[in-house]
């Protein structure tokens, strides 16, 4: 969220506890972090406190539990969180959260296998209070790496939100990949689909590196609307297509 004219405070405390006498367990990392934003008039716009414990195993796997988040959102104007959702009266329409201060709590659990292995899996879930209601958001990802040339990953996030003003669900699916032809030439791709907006976005980048991060970069961006009619009344089809070619060169002017 972009902010202007605000006061801000943040902090973090982390402790590493090694267990030398246990072969299969590496370390325990309890920690707490947080931040808070105020307007110049003293209104608390938001705060976030995160309390968690990470259990790191010798085989590279980790478990984070139980994470506990304390969150707060201050709204000095109504906030439309959804263009269309299920309203309490059984109809469909925009979901608008009224003015107020919302203090919430949520729990989270995260686990992953060894991320440096050729094949790794990550999964987690967050659930708890959200504005005037509740939210649950499980997610998962699978990553594959072949030597130092190929890396791929597929992930999915799901959000189930139930508020006094209405309810909705959203899914986000993402596929990423990177292939290195040589240490200086690579191809990267990022595909993302949001079932809320019905948009399929893609970003493809070809890089041919020179010294100090310079070189040739070719980037193609594309957004396709896969629904019937979007909120502006347009039918399915392309929404954005962009091709960017950039070349930079570093010169030594001192001879």
Provide a role label for each language-model segment:
Residues 1-255:
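Exposed, low-structure sequence patches enriched in small/polar residues
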């Amino acid at each position: 969220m972009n902010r202007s004219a605000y006061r801000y405070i943040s902090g973090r405390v982390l402790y590493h506890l090694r267990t030398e006498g246990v072969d299969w367990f590496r370390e325990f990392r309890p920690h707490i972090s947080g931040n808070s934003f105020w307007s110049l008039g003293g209104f608390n716009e938001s705060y976030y406190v995160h309390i968690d414990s990470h259990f790191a195993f010798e085989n590279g796997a980790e478990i984070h539990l139980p994470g506990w988040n304390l969150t707060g959102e201050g709204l000095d104007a109504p906030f439309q969180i959804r263009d269309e959702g299920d309203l309490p009266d059984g109809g469909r329409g925009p979901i608008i959260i009224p003015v107020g201060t919302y203090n919430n709590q949520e729990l989270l659990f995260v686990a992953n296998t060894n991320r440096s292995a050729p094949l790794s899996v990550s999964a987690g879930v967050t659930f708890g209070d959200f504005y005037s209601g509740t939210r649950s958001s499980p997610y998962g990802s699978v990553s594959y790496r072949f030597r130092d040339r190929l890396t791929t990953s597929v992930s999915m996030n799901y959000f189930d939100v139930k508020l006094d003003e209405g309810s909705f669900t959203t899914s986000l699916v993402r596929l990423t990949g990177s292939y290195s032809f040589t240490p200086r030439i690579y191809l990267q791709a990022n595909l993302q689909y949001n079932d809320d907006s019905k948009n399929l976005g893609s970003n493809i980048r070809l890089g041919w590196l020179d010294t100090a991060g310079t070189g040739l970069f070719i980037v193609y961006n594309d957004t396709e609307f896969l629904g019937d009619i979007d909120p502006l009344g347009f039918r399915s089809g392309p929404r954005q297509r962009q091709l960017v070619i950039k070349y930079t060169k570093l010169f030594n002017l001192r001879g």
